[in-house]
Amino acid sequence: RQALCYVSGLIISTFAQSPLAHQFLELIIGFGIAGTGMGMILAVVGRASSEKNRSMALGIVTAAGSVGQMVGAPLAQFLLNLYEWQQVFIIFAFSIVLVMTVVPLLKETPVSSKKEIEVSLTKVVGNAFKDPNFSMIFLGFFACGYQLAFVSAHFPAMVTEMCSAISPSSLLHYFGVSTTSGLGALAIALIGFSNIFGTIYAGWLGQKFPKKYLLAIVYALRTLTVSYTHL
């Protein structure tokens, strides 16, 4: 269902005629991503891993997700150079459909009966927020997600607007980056490339030091870095 929500959001977005319509449809896409993205994958890996290896396992899985960021941004820009943005949305929606065809082939793990696991969402959320530890983690990951979304949405546009035209004789042009929008996509890809090594290293550190302090340091350094870049 979540994947269908993701696909539907992408397809319907091709008919959007205003920024407000795009923002509304982004909510639908967001619901789809919430049920199919890295958050769900990390939860599964976290439960399946032992306490000793959990931190490193999560780091490796996150690094694999960064490979998608490294490849996805330049691929999207390449497709935008060939097709209209509506067609690119359809292409990505079709790629999600292809992944969905593989899901029935995966072996399901036996779960508890529906009666045993059926709990209202209101009760689950209420119990979670009664725990101060969850509230602190929630605020931390809210800041993390906000920063990631902000960088992903605005950093390529900032690079596109602030950089001058790329010279045909430049090294960038030689490697196929001929426009400032292409340079913006490359910038996001470089962030993903760096994140591959950063998340694996963070996973290793998580096996050696308290994770809450590591998270605090990572978030603080990211905030300072983004602030310095803005200035």
Task: Give residue spans per PLM region.
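Juxtamembrane intracellular "pre-TM" segments in multi-pass secondary transporters
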Residues: 112-134
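Paired small-residue
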Residues: 9, 20-28
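Helix-loop-helix hairpin linking two adjacent transmembrane segments in secondary transporters
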Residues: 61, 65-105
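Cytoplasmic helix-loop-helix junction between adjacent transmembrane helices
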Residues: 29-63
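Cytoplasmic membrane-interface "Motif A"-like loop-to-helix N-cap segments
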Residues: 1-3, 208-219
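Helix-to-loop junctions at the C-terminal end of transmembrane segments
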Residues: 199-210
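Extracytoplasmic gate region of multi-pass secondary transporters
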Residues: 133-189
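Conserved small/polar residues in nucleotide/adenosyl-binding loops
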Residues: 229-230
